[in-house]
Design a protein with these regions (language model features):
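Sec-dependent N-terminal signal peptides
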Residues: 4-14
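Surface-exposed acidic loop/strand-edge motifs in secreted or periplasmic proteins
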Residues: 50-101, 106-110, 124
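Long terminal segments
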Residues: 2-3, 20-73, 148, 154-227
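Eukaryotic tandem repeat interaction scaffolds
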Residues: 131, 153-154
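Conserved positions within tandem-repeat grammars
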Residues: 89, 93-96, 101-104, 112, ...
């Protein structure tokens, strides 16, 4: 009986931890990070900006049969709860529950630079670069769970500053300001995957020439947008 209870508890904890996970990293056409996408239960997705703000969330009807390239989300009809006026001033009005997933935020008594920022999505915790750190990435996400997020610093090439450099063990490299104007600043490689663009002298200038717009690295999708 004890063994049975242990198995049930273990399965419940496993489901709690893995029901929230980062599902996609979207990169804009200019090389800037567009969103980090997180998958919850019931085909719900949360889109976060690089400074940890929730840009949108909702039901992703495309999950299971095709990629949601445009990021179109439908209203979620399950449990939705918000922090009330009785909660800490930095939390009031923010989304608290989406289904059974709890979202928490840094409170008003915590570090001034963190107040109101997203602290956790379920079991996934977030930390941020603080005000004393490099100007190119202060205020941006520093960790997502156990993954370290590194951004190009202000002393690096002008077309790289503030762009995503490392997501955990995955490295992102960009064309710098000395490259052809048609693709300077664009993503050049993600891990072992390379991207080549049409030059300013070619017909489809700046469009992707070789490389896939959607790749999968260690279970996380990286999507290169054309805009």
């Amino acid at each position: 009986m004890k063994k049975f209870i242990f198995v049930i508890v273990t399965l419940l904890l496993f489901n709690l931890v893995f029901s929230q996970q980062i599902s996609k990293v979207a990169i804009s056409g200019n090389g800037q990070l567009d969103v980090f996408a997180f998958g919850l239960d019931e085909q719900v997705q949360i889109y976060l900006s690089k400074d940890g703000n929730i840009s949108k969330w909702g039901f992703d009807r495309f999950i299971g049969y095709q990629e949601n390239y445009n990021g179109d989300l439908l209203p979620y009809v399950g449990r939705i709860e918000y922090y009330s006026q009785n909660d800490d001033e930095s939390l009031r009005g923010k989304i608290k529950y989406i289904g059974k997933t709890l979202l928490t935020y840094y409170a008003s008594y915590e570090n001034e630079a963190l107040k109101g920022k997203l602290k956790s999505i379920g079991a996934i915790n977030f930390d941020y670069y603080l005000t004393y750190e490099d100007a190119a990435y202060r205020g941006l996400i520093k960790t997502i769970g156990r993954k370290m997020i590194v951004w190009y610093a202000s002393y690096e090439n002008v077309d790289l500053r503030g762009k995503l450099k490392n997501f955990g063990s995955t490295t992102l490299i960009y064309y710098n300001s000395f490259e052809d104007k048609a693709f300077r600043g664009k993503i050049k490689s993600i891990d072992r995957f390379a991207f080549v663009y049409y030059s300013s002298f070619e017909q489809y200038s700046s469009s992707l020439k070789t490389g896939s717009t959607l790749i999968n690295i260690n279970g996380i999708k990286y999507y290169l947008k054309s805009y």
